[in-house]
Amino acid sequence: MPSEAKRLPVGPNSTLILKGPASARLVEGSLEVLGYRPGSKERLVAKPWRSLPLYSREGAIVEVSLGEGGGAEIVGEDTIPDDWRELSSSLGDSFRLMVIGMVDSGKTSLITYLYNTHVPRGRMVVADLDMGQSEICPPTTIALAIGGKPSPSLSALEPNRVYPVGYTSPSYLTSRALESVAELSSTIGSERRLLVNTDGWVDGEAARRHKSQLIRILKPSHVVLIGMGEADDLVEASEEVGAELTRVSAPKVVLKRDHSARKALRELSYARYLRGARLRSIPRRWLRARPLLLAGLPLEDYLREVIGEMEESAHHLTMLVNGLEMTEAGIGILSYIWAGDRHEPSLALFMGIDDKGFARFYTPYEGTIELMEVGAVILSTDYREVYVLRPRINV
């Protein structure tokens, strides 16, 4: 249950850190949220395991409501680093900027700040490549969104195109992740007002090689490293494409999330995109479906591989699997339904094929299915991550 709303005074040059689940409303004075200026009746929402910095230059009174586990903390300074403001001021009207940094380094906050400070000059394109903690698309996907007005959160942007990757991190299968980014890049074309957010996988040679490839594919004009140390390979890749490389500080206050919190955030997102799902059954011969990551493999063989691997791992739910059907086990493979000229797939949980030859899946989508691409993440019917299929091909 949300707590009773309380009014908190925020002193001049101070920041109220709203920790979700929580909401706030400006009662008196003025606020700035990552470059966004809310009105007095607007409710600002911090989702679970996320935070919003509400900065007041001259002081304000804010009405705050906290959900279970939420919080509010006032710090006596502006938590946005000075070098963020300097970076924003240095950008002209045309730029393609990519932000790279480790998890919980403030990448999304920086992208949001740059978006809000530049969108008043004209529309902005945002590419979200963080397939595990995306703001604008489901987990296991990357996306493009076009924005035309400021917003306290990038989650308010509607995706223009969504590209399934199949995993929650490029570390599972970098080749597949790069293929998806290349497809996204071809859609962007020569767009000159672009912000690119990336995932937080930066430690190790494979991670740095992957980020270098992102630079080479997207050819940004600016590469921004946030809170990072030595990165010679990223410097080299930036020089190859003629990008200006800049280092900026992490925010002064960052909400740290452990592995379980990031997993819980993904599960909330699955639930959001699968809300209203029901079990559908259609004859297998009517369904055009293929494995997303092994397009040449027959779907039935892929199902056997998924179920067999779970059995080898001694997963307890496989005892309830009946042949190629997982309905009784209450699990399904996260999949992507395409129809018509839509550029955003609907999500589904593919439960397998029953002994009567019917394909069974949970989805909120009610229309005709042109293609179902079956991914690699296994979820329960209450949208918990149960298992991830190991890549069978080289990364």
Language-model features: locations:
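A short acidic (Asp/Glu
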Residues: 136-138, 205-209, 216, 233-236
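Conserved lysine of the Walker
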Residues: 107
